[in-house]
């Protein structure tokens, strides 16, 4: 389920108060124990520790820190030749559904760019798909990056093709840290 609004397309994250661009890293989280504190109780929509069983988990962090700004759980989907987004959400302080005072802009687009990047690495040319959490979010993804509404497996299922996914990759810049 995807609970992310795309507020701005920025090459990094943008501090909502100062407008300053903040450099980021993408970190793959392999230790389930680390994910325990990212759960429904504290605004992360699901228990991320459980998602690590069948997915690769990636976090957008401020460069040089473990200050997580968003999480995404993905898995390759060979039948659809795309990456499947199992879950995606921003940190509560970046979630416009939870706070009026956002800390960083650009987290949502950043998370989608990570998925497109991993799709490229898997040989799927950037294609990705998943289930939006609501009709409002589905319409938002159609508008923001020309997602196609599929609605086959879920009423808000969508697909982003290779060309539109590559447009995301042209915007976002980050360092990978998969250690």
Language-model features and meaning:
Residues 1-102, 110, 117-129, 136, ...:
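Non-catalytic substrate-recognition and accessory regions of acyl/acetyltransferase enzymes
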């Amino acid at each position: 389920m995807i609970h992310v609004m795309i507020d701005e397309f920025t090459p990094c994250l943008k501090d909502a108060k100062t407008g300053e661009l903040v450099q980021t890293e993408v970190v793959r989280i392999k230790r389930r124990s680390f994910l325990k504190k990212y759960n429904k109780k504290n605004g992360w929509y699901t228990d991320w520790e459980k998602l690590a069983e069948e997915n690769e988990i990636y976090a957008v962090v401020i460069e040089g820190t473990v200050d997580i700004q968003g999480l995404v759980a993905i898995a390759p989907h060979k039948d659809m030749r795309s990456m499947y987004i199992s879950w995606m959400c921003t940190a509560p302080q970046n979630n416009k559904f939870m706070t009026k005072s956002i800390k960083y802009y650009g987290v949502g687009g950043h998370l989608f760019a990570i998925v497109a990047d991993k799709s490229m690495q898997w040989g799927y040319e950037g294609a990705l798909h998943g289930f939006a959490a609501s009709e409002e979010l589905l319409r938002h993804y159609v508008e923001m990056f020309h997602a196609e509404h599929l609605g086959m497996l879920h009423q808000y299922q969508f697909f982003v093709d290779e060309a539109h996914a590559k447009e995301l990759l042209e915007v976002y810049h980050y360092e990978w840290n998969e250690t």
